[in-house]
A protein has these predicted regions:
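Flavin-dependent oxidoreductase catalytic cores
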Residues: 1-136
């Protein structure tokens, strides 16, 4: 707990989230190696973003945080075209994977009040940045 408290900003930095955040770079790889069956990784949070990745030539997609936050995410996305991940992109799960089981902060029973407060602050900062950048 002390380590996360001291190094939390390094492990779980405040970064504005953008759907399909690696698409621009991924398309450069696709252009350089058009016959290679790349898996798209990065910011697939809805049926719309999944479809965009596939339309851009990626035969497979990877979903991490969306499924970590809701293990039934793919089924919900199949039945509701507008369904979007409830992940708040606080990066808590990333920091946690190096010390404990990787979990979304929403589902952790052992999260401390201090970490809850830190996650809320990160979410507020991310939300502010995302609105400023026009991502929301």
């Amino acid at each position: 707990k002390l380590g996360v408290g001291l190094a939390g900003k390094i492990v779980a930095p405040t970064v504005p989230f953008k759907p399909l955040f690696f698409m621009e770079d991924a398309l450069k790889f696709r252009a350089a190696m058009p016959d290679f069956p790349f898996v798209y990784v990065g910011g697939v949070i809805s049926r719309e973003t999944a479809d965009k990745a596939i339309e851009n030539g990626f035969p497979m997609i990877q979903m991490g945080r969306a499924v970590l936050e809701d293990t039934d995410f793919v089924n919900k996305m199949k039945t509701d075209e507008k369904h979007c991940s409830g992940c708040e992109h606080s990066n808590f799960c990333i920091g946690r994977m190096y010390s404990k089981s990787m979990q979304c902060h929403k589902h952790c029973e052992d999260i401390t009040p201090g970490l809850k407060k830190a996650v809320a602050q990160i979410n507020a900062q991310n939300d502010k940045m995302e609105r400023k950048l026009g991502y929301k």
